[in-house]
Amino acid sequence: MLSYETNARIQELRDKFENIKTTVDVDKIKEKLSRIEKELSDPSVWSDQRRAGKLGQQAQALRSQLDLLNKVQELFENIDIAVELSEEDESYLENLNELLKEAEDMVKEFELNILLSSPYDAYNAYLSVHPGAGGTESQDWASMLLRMYIRWAERNNYKVTTIEEQPGEEAGIKSATINIAGPYAYGKLKYEAGVHRLVRISPFDANHRRHTSFASVSVFPEMDDDVEIDIRPEDLKIDTYRAGGAGGQHVNRTESAVRITHIPTGIVVTCQNERSQHQNKATAMKILKAKLFELELEKKRQEKMKLMGEQKDIAWGNQIRSYVFQPYTMVKDHRTNYETGDVQAVMDGYIDDFIEKELLFFASIDEDKE
């Protein structure tokens, strides 16, 4: 006979899945998928490779939702069979526990899939990191955050492309922007935007004192070309400069790197990874468009955080998460109150629990879907 704990675990998992299912309109998902597949079957759509790629990405995301739903339902059927067998023969209990663990992981994944249902959640993401005041220490912290997100992206099998990276004078980075490509990259990362605080004994302090450093993270969706954003030429200041890595590595002899300032908002974007000034300008304009679009989304949602190219006042006031290395180890999100003592795992990109808690938190306060 199954223990009370096992029965309660099964019932809790089943109730959670049924509650999530009530938020899913399967017919609507199938209808949308059918419409996209019909469009993709038209040979003319492939004349625009970018649009075809976006449609393919949307179709992949919808199929993923349907496949996951079917897999979880099949898993519960197998659990029911395992329960019957376990009541007759306790040797089947191990198999039942394995199925329950698999079901818990799948229900968690399904829940995230449903939470990521805003129109732009399925898009690729741009992610920028900027250090706060504090020189080398904060610049090193910014590079640690950048590494954390790259590791997270790699663990999710996302493609990471560096758009621009300006190395610090002694260590770390002065700024960096990367593109993270994959299903729901933006939806998963959008609430990572904000100020991240580090407390540690600085390796750059000869007296080994404890330092507090800040760095800001901005996240914005990679927009389709057909999304219209009004950008007036007279509102732009465009500068060019020589691109190159730290220590004079791979220095470009021509001024191919581009910096664009959007004067009305103060947003600044740079790009130096392309081969020509023309390509860098095109990429920078695309990023500017994405930032302006995200800024409008933020205003509509009436959220406190604002995504700006130049992060101002990166300090205590608007921090979202603290990372404490000494005198104890803890990472704590100040919005959800979720925390863990395994700082090293977090810095190695294991931040899915934080992302899940963020999505649940903002869903619980009934954030308006765009």
From Swiss-Prot:
Which Gene3D superfamilies does the protein's record reference? 3.30.160.20, 3.30.70.1660, Release factor (1.20.58.410)
Example of a GO MF term:
translation release factor activity, codon specific
Keywords per UniProt: Cytoplasm, Methylation, Protein biosynthesis
| Residue numbers carrying N5-methylglutamine | Q249
List the PROSITE patterns hit by this protein, alphabetically. Answer: RF_PROK_I
Q: Which domain of life is it from?
A: Bacteria
Task: Tell me one Pfam family matched here.
Answer: PCRF
Q: Where in the cell is it found?
A: Cytoplasm
NCBIfam families per the UniProt record, alphabetical: prfB
The similarity annotation says:
Belongs to the prokaryotic/mitochondrial release factor family.
Protein purpose: Peptide chain release factor 2 directs the termination of translation in response to the peptide chain termination codons UGA and UAA.
Family annotation (PANTHER family) = CLASS I PEPTIDE CHAIN RELEASE FACTOR, PEPTIDE CHAIN RELEASE FACTOR 2
Q: What is this protein called?
A: Peptide chain release factor 2
Q: Which species expresses this protein natively?
A: Kosmotoga olearia (strain ATCC BAA-1733 / DSM 21960 / TBF 19.5.1)
